[in-house]
C-alpha cells in the first residue's frame, strides 16, 4: 500500500529522527524527484514543525537555504516537505578520518560565513553553529554548503526599525557547549558575534581534529559544562591556533572584540581567508577532501571550471533564488500510523541506501570505522542522503534534560 502526503508525494522509508518528529525519504509522484518529509504528530505536547517551517520560509531565497516544497496536515500528522540534501560536515569529517586539509577548511569557511551573514540579514541569529548543522547539496549542487536547523534561532532585531534586542545577563541559554562562545558560557544574551565565534571553533575543530575542551570528565553534565567553560576561557586563542596560519587567531580575536550589538564585518572575515587561500596557491576548483577519497584522482579541468562558474552564479543570485533541504527519518509507518495517511493501490517503491550512523562528535557506537566509511562512500557515489542529526528537530522549549557537550539542546546557565 502506497502512503501519500498532500496527494502529491510518496512517503518512503524512515531516514532519521529527532526529539519532536521523524524524517522520511519521499518522492514527488509526478516527477520522481526525491524529497525529505518531516512528520510530527499533531497531538505532540510541544508542536515545533509549524514554527520550524515558518523559519525556513522566512529564509527562502538565499543560497544554501533548504527550500520548502509543501507544508500542511495529513491525518494525525503535521507535515513539511523539503528538498533533499546530502551528508553533514560532521559526517564528512568522520569520513575523512576526522581531519580536513587547510584547503578544504578555507573553502568551507568562505561559504559558512556567507550562510551566517544571510541569516543575520534576515534579522535572526542561529545560536547553534556546529558541523552537524551544515550539509552539502546533492548532484549539481554537491559543492554547495547548506545551513539547517532553526530550532534554536532567535530574532535579534526588529525587521522594520532594526532596533537590536537589549543586552541581558544571567540567561538560561541554548546551544552546543563544545562550540559555544565565551559570552554564551557566561550567560550573556547571544547576538551576531556569538554565531561567528562559534564558527571559529568549528574551523579549528576541522583543523585540529578535536578541541582542547573535548573529553573532559565530570561527575555530572552540569559540572562538565563548567569544565568546558573554564578550559575554553583559560586557553589563549594563540595557543588554540598554534601551528596554523595566523588568520584563524585573527578571526577569533576579531569575533571576541565585537560589542553586543555590533554588526560584524563579514566581508573582512571572508577576505582574511580568501587572501590566505591565494597565498597558499590553492585553486577554487571546489575539490574537497571527500571528493579526493571519492574519485581518487583529479577531475576533468572543464568540469572544474564549469562547477566554479555555476557556484559563482549561485552566489550572485542568492538574494533572488531559493535552493535545496536535508534528509529526514527508518521505514514507513505501519499499522495505525499507516491508516492515518492516505493510501493508494500501487506498491511502495523501494528506496536506496542503508543508513549512515549519526556520530555526533564521537566515534559511532554501533558500527566500525571501516563500516561507517564504506556507508558514507556509498552515499557519495550514489548521491544518496545522509541520515539527519538529532539536532534537526531540536525544539526551542526549555526542556529539563541536560545533554552531552556536542548535543544542541537548551542548557542552563551555570553561573546563576
Curated annotation (Swiss-Prot):
GO terms for biological process: canonical Wnt signaling pathway; cellular response to nerve growth factor stimulus; circadian behavior; circadian regulation of gene expression; circadian rhythm; negative regulation of Wnt signaling pathway; positive regulation of amyloid-beta formation; positive regulation of canonical Wnt signaling pathway. InterPro entries: CK1_Ser-Thr_kinase, Kinase-like_dom_sf, Prot_kinase_dom, Protein_kinase_ATP_BS, Ser/Thr_kinase_AS. Residues 301-318 have a biased composition (Basic and acidic residues). Residues 9-277 form the Protein kinase domain. Gene3D superfamilies: Transferase(Phosphotransferase) domain 1. Residues 351-365 have a biased composition (Polar residues). Disruption phenotype: No visible phenotype. Has no apparent effect on circadian oscillation of protein levels. Mice exhibit a small but significant increase in circadian period length. GO terms for cellular component: cytosol; growth cone; neuronal cell body; nucleoplasm; nucleus; ribonucleoprotein complex. Keywords: ATP-binding, Biological rhythms, Cytoplasm, Kinase, Methylation, Nucleotide-binding, Nucleus, Phosphoprotein, Serine/threonine-protein kinase, Transferase, Wnt signaling pathway. The modification Phosphoserine is found at residues 343, 354, 363, 389, 405, 408. Its EC number is 2.7.11.1. Expressed in all tissues examined, including brain, heart, lung, liver, pancreas, kidney, placenta and skeletal muscle. Expressed in monocytes and lymphocytes but not in granulocytes. PROSITE patterns: PROTEIN_KINASE_ATP, PROTEIN_KINASE_DOM, PROTEIN_KINASE_ST. It is an enzyme of class 2 (transferase). It is found in: Cytoplasm; Nucleus. Residues 301-416 are annotated as: Disordered. Casein kinases are operationally defined by their preferential utilization of acidic proteins such as caseins as substrates. Participates in Wnt signaling. Phosphorylates DVL1. Phosphorylates DVL2. Phosphorylates NEDD9/HEF1. Central component of the circadian clock. In balance with PP1, determines the circadian period length, through the regulation of the speed and rhythmicity of PER1 and PER2 phosphorylation. Controls PER1 and PER2 nuclear transport and degradation. Inhibits cytokine-induced granuloytic differentiation. This is Casein kinase I isoform epsilon. It comes from Mus musculus. The lineage of its organism: Eukaryota, Metazoa, Chordata, Craniata, Vertebrata. The gene is Csnk1e.
Amino acid at each position: 500500500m502506497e502512503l501519500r502526503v498532500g496527494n502529491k508525494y510518496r512517503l518512503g522509508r524512515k531516514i532519521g529522527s529527532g526529539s519532536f518528529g521523524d524524517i522520511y525519504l519521499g518522492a514527488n509522484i509526478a516527477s520522481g524527484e526525491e524529497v525529505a518529509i518531516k512528520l510530527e504528530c499533531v497531538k505532540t505536547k510541544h508542536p515545533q514543525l509549524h514554527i520550524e517551517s515558518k523559519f525556513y520560509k522566512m529564509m527562502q531565497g538565499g543560497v544554501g537555504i533548504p527550500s520548502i516544497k509543501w507544508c500542511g496536515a495529513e491525518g494525525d500528522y503535521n507535515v513539511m516537505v523539503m528538498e533533499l540534501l546530502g551528508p553533514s560536515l560532521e559526517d564528512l569529517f568522520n569520513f575523512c578520518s576526522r581531519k580536513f586539509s587547510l584547503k578544504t577548511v578555507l573553502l568551507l569557511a568562505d561559504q559558512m560565513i556567507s550562510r551566517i551573514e544571510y541569516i543575520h540579514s534576515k534579522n535572526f541569529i542561529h545560536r547553534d553553529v556546529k558541523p552537524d548543522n551544515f550539509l552539502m547539496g546533492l548532484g549539481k549542487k554537491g559543492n554547495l554548503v547548506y545551513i539547517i536547523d532553526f530550532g534554536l534561532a532567535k530574532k535579534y532585531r526588529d525587521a522594520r526599525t532594526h532596533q537590536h534586542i537589549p543586552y541581558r545577563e544571567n540567561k538560561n541559554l541554548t546551544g552546543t557547549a563544545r562550540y559555544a562562545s565565551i559570552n554564551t558560557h557566561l550567560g550573556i544574551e547571544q547576538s551576531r558575534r556569538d554565531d561567528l565565534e562559534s564558527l571559529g571553533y568549528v574551523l579549528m575543530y576541522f583543523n585540529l581534529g578535536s578541541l582542547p575542551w573535548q573529553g573532559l570528565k565530570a561527575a555530572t553534565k552540569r559540572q562538565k559544562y563548567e569544565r568546558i567553560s573554564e578550559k575554553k576561557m583559560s586557553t589563549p586563542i594563540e595557543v588554540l591556533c598554534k601551528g596554523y596560519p595566523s588568520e584563524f587567531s585573527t578571526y577569533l580575536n576579531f569575533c571576541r572584540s565585537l560589542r553586543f550589538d555590533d554588526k560584524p564585518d563579514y566581508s573582512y572575515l571572508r577576505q582574511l581567508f580568501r587572501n590566505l587561500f591565494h597565498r597558499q596557491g590553492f585553486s577554487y576548483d571546489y575539490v574537497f577532501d571527500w571528493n579526493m577519497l571519492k574519485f581518487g584522482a583529479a577531475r576533468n579541468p572543464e568540469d572544474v571550471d564549469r562547477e566554479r562558474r555555476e557556484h559563482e552564479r549561485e552566489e550572485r543570485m542568492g538574494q533572488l533564488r531559493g535552493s535545496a533541504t536535508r534528509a529526514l527519518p527508518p521505514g514507513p509507518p505501519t499499522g495505525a500510523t499507516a491508516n492515518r495517511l492516505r493510501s493508494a493501490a500501487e506498491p511502495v517503491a523501494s528506496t536506496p541506501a542503508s543508513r549512515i550512523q549519526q556520530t555526533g562528535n564521537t566515534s559511532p557506537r554501533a558500527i566500525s570505522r571501516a563500516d561507517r566509511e564504506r556507508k558514507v562512500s556509498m552515499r557519495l557515489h550514489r548521491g544518496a542522503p545522509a541520515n539527519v542529526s538529532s539536532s534537526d528537530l531540536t525544539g526551542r522549549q526549555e526542556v529539563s534534560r541536560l545533554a552531552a557537550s556536542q548535543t544542541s539542546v537548551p542548557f542552563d546557565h551555570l553561573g546563576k
